């Protein structure tokens, strides 16, 4: 099949795998991420990748998902981006260990801040306004993630 690419993680809505792999490594979805409504699959498949299993993605396979109207607005996008920043910190620490994960988290903070700042001169273009807000939200989520992860339980909406 064309367009097959090796990746380190995938979403759980379009995956086939052998159950023996799950049993062998006693893998499960991290319940600490339930309150976010996202991220459980990313962490699960990153662990699978770290065990040496190959994960492939193909853009020729079509997967559809219902559109939720309450998610089709800028406010929801900003909150989701913040959540992704916060849980990104948790995933980095879970995969790489406490110190390395902490360092990676703050390097990603710098990355998201610099991406947002690089678009600041294009602020009058609506497309870039959304991108700037998205990057700043992700930056802020990463920045405060180590301090607020356990306290967040209201962002799942």
Language model features: what each stretch is:
Residues 20, 43, 62:
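Active-site phosphate/pyrophosphate-handling residues
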Residues 11-26:
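Conserved nucleotide-sugar donor-binding
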Residues 44-45, 77, 88:
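Short, hydrophobic alpha-helical packing/hinge segments within bilobed ligand-binding/sensory domains
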Residues 34-46:
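Acidic donor-binding loop at a coil-to-helix junction in glycosyltransferase catalytic cores
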Residues 8, 15, 56:
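Residues that recognize and position ribonucleotide moieties
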Residues 1-8:
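Short, flexible, basic/aromatic active-site loop/helix in glycosyltransferases
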Residues 31-32, 36, 51-75:
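Active-site donor/metal-binding and catalytic loop motifs
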Residues 79-86, 96-157:
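Non-catalytic, C-terminal membrane-associated alpha-helical segments of glycosyltransferases
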């Amino acid at each position: 099949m064309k367009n097959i690419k090796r990746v380190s993680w995938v979403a759980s809505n379009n995956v086939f795998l052998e159950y023996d792999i799950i049993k062998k490594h006693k893998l499960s979805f991290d319940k600490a991420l339930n309150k976010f409504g996202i991220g459980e699959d990313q962490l699960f498949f990153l662990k699978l990748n770290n065990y040496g299993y190959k994960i492939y993605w193909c853009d020729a396979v079509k997967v559809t998902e219902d559109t939720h109207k309450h998610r089709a607005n800028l406010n929801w996008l900003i909150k989701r981006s913040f959540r992704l920043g916060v849980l990104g910190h948790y995933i980095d620490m879970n995969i790489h260990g406490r110190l390395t994960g902490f360092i990676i988290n703050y390097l990603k903070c710098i990355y998201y801040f610099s991406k947002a700042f690089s678009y600041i001169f294009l602020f009058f273009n609506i497309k870039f306004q959304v991108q700037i807000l998205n990057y700043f939200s992700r930056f802020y989520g990463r920045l405060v993630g180590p301090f607020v992860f356990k306290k967040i339980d209201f962002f799942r909406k």
